[in-house]
């Protein structure tokens, strides 16, 4: 059984063909999907997709790129979304200093607010970290009762070990298949029962499909790597 632990099914390239996308995933051996929200509105779209698909679950969160756009009361909306049974996690949340679409201080504020929601609801988190490992690990360590997954992991073995020590899982996506990727060496040092896989579709198509739109069925290339 393969679970695509992180995909964004509300993008038009997937949502407009959702039945066939799900069928191709099932044909490839993918039995469960997690549709991950990156802001309140997209989290609502994830929820809508799960209503007619028992094998799809969803999460609600605010991506660090979207942290600058949160409005008063957004936390209340997250709480309301998390009342639905199919909403299984808070995410995706975290820090991204690579592009800095949101000021780092705003990112940290929103990240902490959402970690507090996860702590309050006893829900796992889906973590996004890019060029922000030191700050992110520090914040995560402040919420010792919260566990989750470091999604689309692309950092060092040392960072992976820091996540593992905090009780987190490490999820690998199509970038592990890229030429000259260091990630095949990283994954060798991680206990198999702490490894997860994902597509992050419609992004990050694995080799040999790199450069094309991604979808859950292509997770088989990541698994085989």
Show where each model-derived region lies:
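Mid-domain alpha/beta scaffold segments of enzyme catalytic cores
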Residues: 1-225
